[in-house]
């Protein structure tokens, strides 16, 4: 039975066929699609399916947070709405998810947000799909954060103030953190929630998505300094050590060796030895967990990811220093 106190906000930008699958999964439920300047036929496709559409204007810049807030504002004009399902346009809801999740929220009024198992559409098509699927494998139980697909209690949304429009990355963990600060619980349950279609096939796509993570870590630390409810400061410190301090030490040692004392080259050698040893440690650990075929490449991506995150972190700092609004870090194919 479709409940009248539940509605769905779908957001997207140039999602193509992924959006059609996403909107099809919401049929029967009250929903709205919020488009962030798509250059494809997303808006027309949504309207053909009978879904109300909000087209964001480009003047304020596009962000997932702004899109979600626009959908929330429209749907909450109806005071009977108690729960809102957030859904990214690259994901399709699993049948029965909303019934399972709303029943849980009905029974536990202190729960502000609930999500279930997100699975990748083609996890074996490439290492990227496999890494997506692994990332989505959140254990059931209390959770600190949620992603773009989550069922939210309207009272909790209002209490925490919604998403931050000006965040181009990290808007979901930021909102999750503010929900917890306001006293709400977040939980993951062992139930299928949605199918995600990352459609990632190129290294450049992975690199830009990982850059976005570095940008998010930097901004989350700045927005929530000293909070005991997160460890983003530790994540930022790891980025700065592996992709900042060590490379600088290697270059400095090399310059000293070239200009002053050849023995200083030992510093560069030690840095590379440390990198190799850390890569070997991670490769062994992940190979034991996932097998050599997946574990070894995954270890390499984890190491390389620190450099992509460093680029994103520096991008955030540069924009902040210049008091300039950031622009989307896009990675998807149209």
What are these regions (language model features)?
Residues 79-92:
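Short beta-strand-to-loop acidic/aromatic patch adjacent to the donor-nucleotide binding site
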Residues 35-44, 58, 91:
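A conserved acidic beta->alpha catalytic loop
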Residues 58-77:
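Glycine-rich, basic loop-to-helix element that forms the pyrophosphate-binding segment
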Residues 120-121, 135-152, 159, 167-168, ...:
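A recurrent flexible, glycine/aromatic-enriched loop bordering the glycosyltransferase active site
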Residues 243-318:
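Membrane-embedded multi-pass helical conduit in multi-pass membrane proteins
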Residues 10-28:
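Short, well-formed alpha-helical segments that are part of the catalytic scaffolds
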Residues 166-167, 173-231:
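Catalytic donor/gating beta->alpha subdomain of glycosyltransferases that bind UDP-sugars
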Residues 92-126, 197:
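Conserved donor NDP-sugar-binding/catalytic core segment of glycosyltransferases
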